[in-house]
């Protein structure tokens, strides 16, 4: 009798352990995604795409990390599998990390905003503090390019992750000069008319945000990642075709519920500007786009060597986005 009770207890324990193990495996199989930087309205596209992909079987866990540096550290220590919102050029070339970008998400679209009472031109910023998003970010690259173009030298180039955070710092007066993305610039100008000035800046064609993962992970999880890339490209194209689409999807999917009313009211205007200026490329990246990145990031020092000598295949796996383009073309 005791033996039977023992077997029953053992079987129950084993069954529970099997269920627990299966549950842990299911959790472990989630694609762990790291979003570099605070969630701002320009990241609404990937949030909608993640919801679309989830409905199609893409199981993921999203972590919003404070900065590019923290996100890359989590990536290097295998705490996350996929990074959204920055690039891996320095990681691949200098640290020899086996990683590939697989879709271009956003192009550089930042404007230099200064406190008008302190500065009227780039020359006024010589010897002054300037604030950018993060080390190796597009904003840091642009700041150093403006130093060279205007023959000035900033006292310090300091890091404050997140354009909305820098926008609020401008409004509080704790900083006086920075790069902001378009929605944050619009927010600052509306909040304090006449107090801030946008300085002239040259146009650049390079990735501000891409999506990347380690090559072994891409090879093992191509099916899941293809679902995500398909969704990203679909949402980008629908948003560019009609900015009202992304606003309606935000409301339907209940995304960014705590977005301030003034920012929510400005969504359509932002995405119209984004569509007109090509901030979200309809193609998701190709060899020509990567070569533009090489030119920009070698000029900045993030990549070394001559742009013409760098190989696309060393930094990018374009097969996923190429497949997504074919699928979208076939459904027209």
Q: What kind of region is each of these model predictions?
A:
Residues 2-13:
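Bacterial N-terminal signal peptides that target proteins for export
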Residues 28, 47, 144, 186-189, ...:
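Predominant activation on well-ordered alpha-helical scaffold segments within soluble catalytic domains
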Residues 86-95, 104-111, 262-266, 317-332:
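Amphipathic, soluble alpha/beta structural segments
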Residues 87-88, 165-258:
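Pocket-lining segment of extracytoplasmic ligand-binding domains
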Residues 221-305:
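Secondary-structure end/capping motifs
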Residues 291-332:
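Conserved C-terminal helix/tail region of periplasmic/extracytoplasmic solute-binding proteins
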